[in-house]
Structure formats: structure tokens, C-alpha cells
A protein has these predicted regions:
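Intrinsically disordered, low-complexity regulatory regions in eukaryotic proteins
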Residues: 1-102
Length: 102
């Protein structure tokens, strides 16, 4: 189950569980759409994968206790700003490869 991390790991922007700006990679590293587009170039600095919009967990118990009340979002902040120079070097050989082919 997704943790639904509360902030962008680069800029520390608040990303509530219903945020349309949250992006995650397959390992759930979480960034805001602005950082994904303008800083990371859709290359995760931790795994090299791409990003997708983070799903929004239902706020109501529509079925089977699968909702925020039963499984609340994480409150643990993971603020690890990316070094732009190091990321540029890391992402250079893979940034032009589509995420589904990385």
C-alpha cells in the first residue's frame, strides 16, 4: 500500500493525500510536478525511473475499509534535496530513454 508521503522530497512542498501535483516513481519516491518537470527531467534521482501521478486514496469508506480513515497518509517527511549537478551527470545517459524502456 502506498505511504502517501506528505511532501516533495526535493523542495519540501506540502503534498496532501488528495494533491493533483504529487508524482511518484515505482519505489514511491515522491516529488511535486514542478520539481519532476523542471529539476529532475522525469528521471528519478534515486532509481532512474520515470514518474506518474500519485493515486488519490478515497476519503470515504465506499467498500471494505479501503479509505483514508483506515489507512491514513504518512506524516514522515523525507526532505532530501537533489544536487542539480550530480543529477545532471546521473540522468544524462538515460533521460532520453522513455521511462517504460529504462
Amino acid at each position: 500500500m502506498l505511504e502517501l508521503r506528505p511532501t516533495c522530497e526535493h523542495c519540501n512542498k506540502t503534498l496532501p493525500s488528495d494533491s493533483l501535483e504529487a508524482r511518484i516513481c515505482t519505489y514511491e519516491y515522491t516529488f511535486c510536478v514542478t520539481c519532476v518537470d523542471s529539476v529532475l527531467g522525469n528521471v528519478c534521482p534515486n532509481c532512474g525511473g520515470g514518474f506518474v501521478p500519485r493515486p488519490i486514496r478515497p476519503s470515504k469508506n465506499w467498500k471494505g475499509d479501503n479509505f483514508l480513515g483506515k489507512d491514513p497518509p504518512s506524516t514522515k517527511i523525507k526532505h532530501r534535496p537533489v544536487d542539480p549537478a550530480a543529477h545532471a551527470k546521473f540522468s544524462a545517459p538515460i533521460k532520453n530513454i522513455p521511462p517504460q524502456k529504462r
